[in-house]
Structures are given as C-alpha cells and as structure tokens.
Amino acid sequence: MPLILTIVMVLLVAAGVGGYFLFSGDSADSGAARPANALSRKWEAASPASERAGQNENGLRSMWFNNDDIIYGDGEGVRAYNRKTGKKKWTVKTPKGAGEVCAMSAEPSDDGVGAVVFDAGGDDCSYLSVVDTDTGRTLWSKNLQDGHGAEHQPRVVVNSKVVAVTIGQTYAGFSVGRGARVWELTARGHECTNSVGLSPQYLAVVSDCSDAKPQKQLSLQDLEYDSIHSTVTGEDHAIVRTLSDWPLTLLTESGSTADPVHYIQTYTDKGKPDHTIQLSGELKDLKFEPRNTYVDEDEQILVAGYGATNGLAAMDMKTGKLLWKKRGSAAIAGVNNQGLMIVTDSPDSGASAVKELVVSVGLRDGKEKVKGTLYEKEHNLPAPSDMSVALDRDNMLFIQSERLTDNRPGVQAFEVPFA
C-alpha cells in the first residue's frame, strides 16, 4: 500500500449582533394570503454573511445536529442553537492566532465530534480545530500551514477514530482524542499524478506513476480500521469526488480536461469493483453538488441535481437507468420513512412557484406527496437550489438562505408534519 498507517419573546437584531425571533404558533405569519397547508415557522436567527459560504463539500453551509441543538457556521463562527427555541447555546472558540472560520466537516462523527477549519493567516485555511458538538468545547487544534501557498478549499472528515484532512500538502489522519498523526499519504514514486477522494470511512487514491509498478493503481483504505484495504491495478479514471460510503461510490472522469467523460463507480464492502456506469445521454445532465447528492444503500439508488434549472433526478446504480427527474429548482432536506424529503418550487402537480413546497418523494417511483408550504408574508425565500436545508429526526426543517429583499442571511426553522 502507498499509505503509511500507524493507525412570545423577541430579541432585536442590532447591526453586527446576532439574535433570534421565537414565533408563537403561526401568529407571526398571519395574513389573508396564507396557504391552508403553511408550515409552522418556529424561529428565525441572524446568520452573518461570510465569503466562505457556498455549496461545496466543506463550505459554511454544513449543519450539524446533537440531541437538542442545530450547529452551523457563518461570518461569526460556528454556533449551536436550541432546535426548538432558536436560543444560542455556545460558540466554538477561535484558536489563538487564527482568524475567521473557513470550513466545517460536512457531518460530525456518530460520537459527536466535528471538525472546523479556520484561517491561519493570509487567507490560508489551514488551522484545524476539533470540537465536542454537545458542548462546543475544543478537544485540540493544529496549525497545518506548510509554506507552499494558501489553501482555499480544505477538506476534512471525521469518524469515531480519525480526523482526516487534505489541507495544502498535508494528506493525513489524526487521532480524534489527542490529535496525534496516525497516518500520512505518501507517493508511490517520484513521477506521479494523483487524485484523491476523502470521506468519513474511506481514503481513495488513484495514482499514475511512470517510475512505479503497476503504473496505474487505485488504492482504497478504510479510515477506521487500518487492516481493511485493497488495490485495483490498471485504474485510469481520475477521482472527482466520493459520493457515498455505503456503498463506496466514486464520481470519476477520463479523457480531456476540456470535455471529460464521467462515470459512477461502486465497490463492495471488500473493496472490489462492483458497477461502473458511464454518464452519457440523459445521465450527462446529472450534477453532483455535495449537498444535493444522496445514495440509498438498500435501494441502490443515487439522487443528484439535474439539468439547467437545478432540479433532481434518480438513477438505478446497478443498471444506470434514469428512474425519474424533477423540473425546476429543488434541494434535498433528508430522508425518513416517508421517503426523500425535498424543497421544490416546481412540484409535479404544476403548482405556482411563488411559494416553495416541502414534498416527500418515493425513491424508486418518484411519486410526490406535498407535506406543506414554506410561507413567509414577505416571500423572501430564494430558489431551493440557493438554500441549504436539513431535516432532523423530529421533522424540523432548517433553512439557511439570504432574504431576497435585502440579501440578509439567516436561519429559519419550520415544523413539517409526519402524517
């Protein structure tokens, strides 16, 4: 292996000061135009703008949950708010010598540990901080600046044992508890080109080394259990992104950089190649934004963005068949026993796109059931594809977005009925 493993109350929002509005029932949103199925809006909190916000894998649109709180990052740092009331609980401490928050792990570990990356100076997103998501307490921090240029798109993932990063020229894993370096990625030769996929469970590396044998190779390493690893000789597709751990699903590409051919490649739990699907024909319109991509292990279905209007579509991962596609703008909120929960401005019923709807979608048949309308008197919500949305186990829907009227960013909580 080429890897070395040692493995009713209102708090006013003043300029620059965060606050929240707690709504009593639906009284704050009363009005003649209110739809009968309008979802109950529970609270709204300010979310100061950050230049780091975006839909990339580790941008400041991640939302974490613990037992009671929602945790998100913005221009004022990473903070926890009570999910029911919107009251702020804590803020992650900025390490000494660090600046604003750059990035967060897409999710915390099952044990409630998350990773945050701060600006280490000079717009270099290299200061790693690992936190307890129940208390906001910093477990450890590490400045990973390496003097080889500023890092603008750090990647960081967390599991029960390891915090893994690609920051600058550091491709490494650190123990969750103390931050000791437990593995480091090293090249197989002196003349190599590499592409890397990083996820909470796996490190995937495709290497093409003219001075090594085999010249081309895919290496898969389980990040929790160092004894679980495999190699695939002759792999010549470069890794674009890891889409899922269960099953391990890679988006890969080959051909020219100007017009590459993309593939979906899946692997067994033993690290052996399973299915490879070339994205041609209708499948070429699939878009794999990290926050709008979902893989269902049981159904073997992949859901991703689709088309020029930022809709959604589902593909059978065994056959490559496109199962369904949704027009308009849509965003994935989560999955529960009712199906895939999405926010859309263009439901299958053809309803008006003035107010976004929360809809459950059957994974295989694409059938929709409207759960309610996202209603605001001011109609300030943007298109779903411009929101970040997350659904918790209590069917509370959280939306990070900027108001259409004044571009003021904030977070809102809506209650979605189970029935």
Residue ranges and their predicted role:
Residues 138-162, 168-170, 177, 181-193:
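Asp-box/WD-like beta-propeller blade repeats and closely related beta-sheet repeat scaffolds
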Residues 1, 55-72, 100-128, 149-167, ...:
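Repeat-blade elements of multi-bladed beta-propeller folds
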Residues 128-136, 215-224, 263-270, 314-316, ...:
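Beta-propeller blade signature
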Residues 21-69, 76-102, 132, 137-146, ...:
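Aromatic (tryptophan-biased) beta-strands that constitute blades/sheets of beta-rich domains
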Residues 221-223, 231, 266-267, 274-282, ...:
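Hydrophobic, structured segments
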Residues 174, 184, 214-217:
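Long, leucine/valine-rich, helix-dominated scaffolding and oligomerization segments
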Residues 310-313, 323-331:
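Flexible, glycine-rich surface segments
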Residues 1-36, 394-399:
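Hydrophobic single-pass membrane-targeting/anchoring helices
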